[in-house]
Amino acid sequence: MDFSLVKELREKTGVGLVKCKEALLEAKGDLEEAIVVLRKAGALSAAKRSDRITGEGYIGLAENESGLALVELNCETDFVAKTATFTEFANRLAQVTLEGRVSSVEELSQLSFPESSAISIEGERSSLVQKTGENIQIRRVLFFPKKAGHSYGVYPHLGNRAVGVVALLCSGQERLAKELAVHVVAFAPKFLSEKDVPQDILRQERDIGLCQAKEKPQAIAEKIAEGKVRDFLAQVCFLHQRSMSEPKLSVSEWIKREEKQTNASISVASFFCWRLLGE
């Protein structure tokens, strides 16, 4: 198959590459006939919807002993986003991502569900567009491998509009990891600790403090600037934030208390939060 023909058909119709290739194969390389094939399949009407805004959706989630997978599936309305057909499709996408350790939307789109191997996932997506009458797009995918000696916590929130994930460097701490994942969703930390914050950001916060205290004596202004930086770190750093479960303790202090109670060494290996339409 001449890829330039596939590309030309894609540019003319707006239909995905996989569907274009299938249409050209059926049309034996005839471009105009391939367009007719796409029209008969309803793919063109689906493509016409592809420029409509997708401001709703659902984050599909799948997990096993080797890893976890997330897939953000977008649609136009919350009505469709809450339907079983839509959420099940997102979770099936996540399961394929998990089993295949998929790393991109493009790779996922060319795969198939095990129960319908004759149809690509891109074809299934187009069918769902036809069924719902909405623009439906796979926005992003992630496969997150698990490591030995770690504990993992996953927390889906607000109908899977947000999913928090925490990995702890310590086995047998799934409960704590889950509680910390809830915290990540609620407080949205950007960094693990002070050492992870870029120096230019810290300097900027300090300069803001000095500017706000410019009428004060230098020694007092310096203390105000230091306080400004501490407050900033308490807002954006995971370990510096107040614990959601124990507000009197920072997350770091909370983890240390768990270490004493379990006689284990616990540290945060990684964390992240996916939010619908987020980065």
Feature map (PLM): residue ranges:
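N-terminal assembly/interaction segments in proteins that build large macromolecular machines
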Residues: M1-E279
